[in-house]
Amino acid sequence: MKSRLSKSTFIRGLQCEKSLYIYKHHYRLKDPTPPSLQAVFDQGTNVGLLAQELFPNGVDASPENHFKMFESVEKTLKFITNGESIIYEATFQFNNVLAALDILVKDQEGW
């Protein structure tokens, strides 16, 4: 897969196609992230960690970095095969589309 389009980059494209193009093809030209926006990103990360506390004892399928999302797909499949029932940052691929979940939980009814 050549390119990854997350929810936030998809929204960026809906808001401004030029912004999406620059972000995906000329990333080094983008303006630095303002501290106020970085605080919003950090808050989102904190919410994710708090959500994990609602489902303790899970395993983390996060990739080493966000440019290695297929690593997360492999970890997710390994965890499912090994019988894990709570997977943080579970990621799946179908037809070159990646879908990442904050928390995947298996209960008596299934996933």
Where are the language model's segments positioned?
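Metal-dependent nuclease catalytic cores that hydrolyze phosphodiester bonds in DNA/RNA
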Residues: M1-G110
